[in-house]
């Protein structure tokens, strides 16, 4: 599967800002909820885990991959991509997060290919910068389609 295959239709968005990290998580997961990739419990599990464990899902400066355990309400494996034009601070993190990659992993294995492809993409500084400075959903989708 290509990386872009993990992103359901309408799962890539550019949003001006979020009032706080909880709203940023809501924005990043709503398309997966609407497409029945996750239950509402899954979103709450991410928030609860963030409060209890900190934002363990920050991947790189400005980039987070909010997710919870499969049994918390992941129904299908998929991803979303949300760019916040104005970054938001997560608890205990000094740098604002602008790019949220919502992850729903229905089991322990089905998302591994997507994570590998995404890691390769994010390791390239130029591509990461393009993601963080994109101005449209189409730009983001074009970048993801390279993975």
Curated annotation (Swiss-Prot):
Q: Which residues form the PTS EIIA type-2 domain?
A: 5-147
Keyword annotations for this protein, in alphabetical order, are: Cytoplasm, Kinase, Phosphoprotein, Phosphotransferase system, Sugar transport, Transferase, Transport
Phosphohistidine-modified residues are where? Answer: 67
User: What Gene3D superfamilies does this protein map onto?
Assistant: Mannitol-specific EII, Chain A (3.40.930.10)
Q: Where in the cell is it found?
A: Cytoplasm
What's in the GO CC field?
A: cytoplasm
Instruction: Provide the active-site residues from the annotation.
Output: 67 (tele-phosphohistidine intermediate)
- Domain text: The PTS EIIA type-2 domain is phosphorylated by phospho-HPr on a histidyl residue. Then, it transfers the phosphoryl group to the PTS EIIB type-2 domain.
Query: What is this protein's function per UniProt?
Result: The phosphoenolpyruvate-dependent sugar phosphotransferase system (sugar PTS), a major carbohydrate active transport system, catalyzes the phosphorylation of incoming sugar substrates concomitantly with their translocation across the cell membrane. The enzyme II CmtAB PTS system is involved in D-mannitol transport.
Q: What is this protein called?
A: Mannitol-specific cryptic phosphotransferase enzyme IIA component
Give the organism, scientific name: Escherichia coli (strain K12)
Gene label: cmtB
């Amino acid at each position: 599967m290509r990386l872009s295959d993990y992103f359901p239709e309408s799962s890539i968005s550019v949003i001006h800002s979020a009032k706080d990290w909880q709203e940023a998580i809501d924005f990043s997961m709503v398309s997966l909820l609407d497409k029945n990739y996750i239950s509402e419990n899954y979103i709450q599990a991410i928030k609860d885990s963030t409060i209890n464990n900190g934002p363990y899902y920050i991947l790189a400066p400005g980039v987070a991959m909010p997710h919870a355990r499969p049994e918390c309400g992941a129904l299908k494996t998929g991803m979303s991509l949300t760019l916040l034009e104005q970054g938001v601070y997560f608890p205990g993190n000094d740098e604002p997060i602008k790019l949220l990659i919502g992850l729903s992993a229905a089991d322990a294995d089905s998302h591994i290919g997507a994570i590998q492809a995404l890691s390769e993409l994010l390791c390239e500084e130029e591509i990461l910068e393009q993601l963080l400075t994109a101005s449209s959903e189409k730009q983001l989708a074009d970048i993801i389609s390279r993975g």
